[in-house]
């Protein structure tokens, strides 16, 4: 019987070397309101690239499932150079959903600017990339709803990536 209430998930496999679907977990990148994000790679060796694997928290509910499904659908519709890409999505053997996203090696935009003591012109060039990503999302009728420095990463070459559409609205 299916329940709409909270469902506990076994998190004993959520450690480096553990498997979630076809992905092997390498290290935890962060923890947020919906769950955790892990650096991962395909365990079967296909698609030799690292991904940011987004997983729900230990107690799973229908509402959280719907939010993850909405994020999946939103990301699938957004292909833009300044928005982290969705590569794969699915569920593992215990029914835990996952999103395999572009792994962006970068720093939050505020840290990037501060550590480099960027001039105003350079900061505005970064902000323009953010604005282009947001405008593109808006053109697809998507509102991010969680724009903050930790959701805007800047790579070593100065490219911006907008992350985390977890509470976005269509």
Regions found by a protein language model. Give the residues of each.
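Conserved ATP-binding/catalytic core of the eukaryotic-like protein kinase fold
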Residues: 5-170
